[in-house]
């Protein structure tokens, strides 16, 4: 089916412009679930490690895949990837992050708030019920750790689109959370003081005012880094999709949202493309290529000013340093 055929020359665009942009400090890789975000972010991180002194790859997806991609266990602390001396990776647990913030370190957040009895349980339930708070606290933990580290460029392997958009709304969520805490403090101040006992402290030494102060300090860090996120010289977002309707729909939605957040995006990676083989005719393959061609043309028409990178469907899994590097 000649009209559906895609030739190798169509695959020329690459992510080389991102590698060449030496000012970049933050790179986000995101898209619909199952389109190859982790593979793309891992491959990009490996290539960046050839051009930069130090690179950090962070997974903010609750269903972490970095460990599977590199055949190496990662956790909430940055760890060098086997075979590299300048490429590290870490996986953030958003639920753990909010508990650490509530506790201020040491004991768990649940133990800290338990000292307030029923009032503590209500405040903890409130914190967890604020829309997007898990993504926000994950973001806060990332920034806190990044602030104390020294990496030339940081790549975020993000969660599927909906989570990622909430993840990028952190400043707004933080404002709402602080507003709720302040409102509760004013409304239930006398009642809280009667629960707290001498010195206005919880049994474990934690103080509600100290909690609020820590959240305010964290907001200051967020404000600083958020300014960098809106700087196209420092930050870009790589959209990953496949040539299908739902993926294209989510990509458009994400790009519109990124524009509203003032976050630069000019690269789209289209994965799982089928290419014709002359000696292996396949009716299903031809039908799928025809469908892919239709959506690929729509992508090129919609995003004619974008760098559209086309990647073929591979015959085997992309796992391990060698395959990711290719």
Curated annotation (Swiss-Prot):
Enzyme category, top tier: hydrolase
Organism for this UniProt entry: Phaeosphaeria nodorum (strain SN15 / ATCC MYA-4574 / FGSC 10173)
Classification of source organism: Eukaryota, Fungi, Dikarya, Ascomycota, Pezizomycotina
Any Pfam family the entry gives: ArsA_ATPase
Assembly and oligomerization: Homodimer.
Family: Belongs to the arsA ATPase family.
HAMAP family listed in its UniProt record: Asna1_Get3 (MF_03112)
A GO cellular component annotation in the UniProt record: GET complex
Protein name as catalogued: ATPase GET3
């Amino acid at each position: 089916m000649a009209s559906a055929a895609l030739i190798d020359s169509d695959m020329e665009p690459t992510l080389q412009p991102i590698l060449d942009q030496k000012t970049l400090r933050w790179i986000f890789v995101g898209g619909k679930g199952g389109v190859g975000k982790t593979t793309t972010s891992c491959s990009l991180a490996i290539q960046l490690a050839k051009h930069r002194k130090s690179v950090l790859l962070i997974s903010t997806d609750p269903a972490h895949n970095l460990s599977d991609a590199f055949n190496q266990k990662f956790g909430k602390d940055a760890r060098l990837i086997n075979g590299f001396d300048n490429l590290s990776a870490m996986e953030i647990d958003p639920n753990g992050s909010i508990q650490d913030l509530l506790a201020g370190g040491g004991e768990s957040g649940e133990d800290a708030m338990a000292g307030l009895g029923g009032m503590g349980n209500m405040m903890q339930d409130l914190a967890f019920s604020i829309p997007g708070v898990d993504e926000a606290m994950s973001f806060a933990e990332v920034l806190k750790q990044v602030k104390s580290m020294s990496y030339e460029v940081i790549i975020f392997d993000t969660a599927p689109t909906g989570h990622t958009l909430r993840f990028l709304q952190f400043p707004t969520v933080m404002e709402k959370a602080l507003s709720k805490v302040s409102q509760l403090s004013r409304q239930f101040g006398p009642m809280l003081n009667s629960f707290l006992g001498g010195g206005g402290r919880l049994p474990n030494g934690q103080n509600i005012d100290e909690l609020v102060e820590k959240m305010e300090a964290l907001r200051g860090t967020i404000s600083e880094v958020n300014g960098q996120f809106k700087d196209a010289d420092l930050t870009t977002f790589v959209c990953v999709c496949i040539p299908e309707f739902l993926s294209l729909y989510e990509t458009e939605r994400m790009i519109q949202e990124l524009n509203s957040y003032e976050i630069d995006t000019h690269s789209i990676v289209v994965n799982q493309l089928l290419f014709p083989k002359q000696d292996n005719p396949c009716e299903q393959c031809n039908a799928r290529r025809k469908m892919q061609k239709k959506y690929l043309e729509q992508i090129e028409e919609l995003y004619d000013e974008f760098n559209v990178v086309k990647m073929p469907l591979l015959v085997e899994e992309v796992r391990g340093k060698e395959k990711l590097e290719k």
